[in-house]
Amino acid sequence: MFDILIRGGSVADGTGRPAFAADVAVSGGRIAAVGDLRGASAAQVWDASGKTVTPGFIDIHRHADAALLRPGFGAAELCQGLTTIVNGNCGLSAAPFGGAHGDAIRDYLRPITGAIPPELVTDTLAGYFACLPALPVNVGMLAGAGVLRADVAGYELEHLADGHYRALHRQLERALADGALGVSLGLGYAPECFYTTRELIRALAPIAGQNIPLTVHMRQEGGGVCQSVEEMLLVARELRIPLHISHLKAMGRDNWGKKIPQALSMLQRAKDEGMDVGCDVYPYTAGSTQLLHILPPEFLEGGMDAVVRRLADPAQRQTLAHRIEDGGGFDDIAKLAGWDGIFLSSLHCPEDEQFLGKSIAEEAAMEHKSPLDSCCDLLIREHCQVTMIDFMAAEEDIAAILRSPLSCLISDATYPTEGMPHPRVYGSCTRLLQHFVGEKGVLSLEEGVRKLTLEPARALRLPGKGVIAEGADADLCVFDPAALSERGTYQQPCRTAEGMTAVFVGGQLAVENGQLTGVKNGRIIRR
């Protein structure tokens, strides 16, 4: 007798091949059989007639490092079919750190991860894992190279000394030994934006030739996106490692429809030459990150206190105005999205609550200031603890990336403690299947499922994940594709997706007829 028998469904097994009629049996947390099991019995039988049965969805790019400890965590994830997530992305992992620069690191991460509680601060990844509560979904972690650098050298612009590199390498090796699934870079963020390409290669020396994935938020994602792809291909070739480009996009209207075909061609050529490369994309034209991200690299030196002093200096602010106007060497989001395309989604000071959900342009009009002055004054008042939602990408580019065989779907979900998060926290998986598969026909259902399952599992080498096959982990979704509904909007983001008939995590029922069961059967996934 099996533990669970899912009868009569249409199985989209994660590989992208056409769906087929089959029963799926589960025993001991694993898939025990797939096929015609009409004579079999089980302790729990599900009728999946008229439904699609898929592997549990996988999001290898979230920022829930600290949110795992919040009451109610898991609802946003499970209701869209997620059974496995990976945190620590963009170089911004909540561990390991804990030295003299710990407070500065927590301040820097807060607009993205939310407040990191003191009990979660630890100088080892093993210590971080030990602090986690029972988990509703499976969770993996990347070693954030930005946090590793900040832990040994702070947020200074100076080139690292030999001793810094030795300390950085020890931390990286320890994190990998503790189970990090790979290494993440955030070259658009401090302090990694201070690296030259050669320095970056030196910093990553411990993973050379080790088949350890490197995921990358590239140095530029606007007009310089192709140069950034070229830089990362050079790094990956020299280190002989797998490369995965995070949230590939071309920011700015002038770049839409032009840069992404070039970038995809570069990645495909590298793949054809034998490199292990891939990329991912989120299914929205708006992103979300620190408002601080609008600043050029030289303005980020020294951490939040130094940034605030710099922004308060009239001469420095004038320099900033020229840098934003002239651009060059960084993603000039103020120009790429426009002040009317940058919205304030997380604020902390009571006096600023009136601006929540407003654009910088709207805030400026309310304050009778220029947009730059309003933005700088807000960053000063909030000590840079502001999250933005910025509209800067094109749906045609998203579709092109989705069509690439190299891509998978991610959310890049950020978890600010206050305010209005991006709706992608709640609906990325559902949006892919509802909008890009069902409404626009960019992908077949089977290909859409592959982008959510086997492809991300391959990217980070997640054994037993992403496929319906005998012996695989029993992370499963049952749903009617026509019934899926994203629900969340930019105005009302905190609405869980609808349409999941059942979601199983490790062979235990986590969602039943759209409702959470309260089961927490997730586990920590280690390399």
Feature roles, as predicted:
Residues 128-162, 168-189, 237, 241-242, ...:
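Active-site neighborhoods of metal-dependent hydrolases
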Residues 1-56, 71:
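Histidine-rich, glycine-flanked metal-binding segment
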Residues 9, 313, 400-406, 411-412, ...:
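C-terminal cap of metal-dependent C-N hydrolases
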Residues 11-23, 386-392, 397-398, 444-449, ...:
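Acidic, glycine-enriched loop/beta-strand segments at the rims
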Residues 95-102, 150-156, 197, 226-230, ...:
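Short acidic, glycine/serine/threonine-rich loops at helix termini
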Residues 9, 24, 29, 50, ...:
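Divalent metal-coordination and catalytic microenvironments
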Residues 90-99, 111-238:
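Hydrophobic, small-residue-rich alpha-helical packing segments that form membrane-like cores
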Residues 38-40, 48-119, 222:
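Metal-associated gating/positioning segment near the N- to mid-region
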